[in-house]
Amino acid sequence: MSRSVLAEGVKPREVWAWAMYDFANSAYTTTVVTAIFNAYFVAVVAGGAAWATLAWTTTQAIASIAIMLTAASVGAWADRHGNKKKLLAITTVGCVAATALLYWVGPGDVVLAMCLVAIASFFFGSGENIIAAFLPELAGDEDLGKVSGWGWSWGYLGGMSCLGLCLAWIVAAKGRGEGAESFVPAAMLITAVFFAVA
């Protein structure tokens, strides 16, 4: 990242740390929301019921509404106390913990799955709002798009990296004769650890 696009006094390593958050948290949306757990929820947790997809989308809608209703007050609190990093840590721990707890979701655990995914998605979305609030502090006005795009690209790389790890685990588990109720929960632990340490 060229220093010329950064705000005055900002070091490249600060932008690197900011972008690496996208690298880490994209593991959640890629494996839980988009590619693995959503299919597991519909086919295994809900047993392929006709209402399963509606239940999944309702869960995401509830989380989105909760984010919408709380974003302004959370942002105001962060601005008033000047402690965005603490809030970001809280949202990260919340999403990681709820994702890890998906390990315990098996066939028939519809309510548990919906609650955990709603919590994880709420913390993820709230964290996205907070991390975005750092951008004007990192880049000059004319270069916000460049720095944002750089972080976005790292997010894609992180999401695909975690998905690759999970799929490698799933292929190996299938080779051992394991079913989805075994290898998908383990993939959720992989996702949680990836988000926590990446």
Map each language-model feature to its residues.
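C-terminal ends and interior cores of transmembrane alpha-helices
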Residues: M68, A89-D109
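MFS 12-TM fold signature
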Residues: Q60, T92-T99, G155, F194-A198
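Cytoplasmic helix-loop-helix junction between adjacent transmembrane helices
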Residues: L116-W154
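Helix-loop boundary and gating motifs at the non-cytosolic
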Residues: R3-S64
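Central cavity-lining transmembrane alpha-helices of secondary-active solute carriers
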Residues: T53-W77, A97-A98, M160-L163
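A membrane-interface helix-boundary motif in multi-pass transporters
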Residues: A49-T57, L167-V193
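Cytoplasmic membrane-interface "Motif A"-like loop-to-helix N-cap segments
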Residues: A78-G94
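Glycine-rich segments within core transmembrane alpha-helices of 12-TM secondary carriers
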Residues: G145-I170
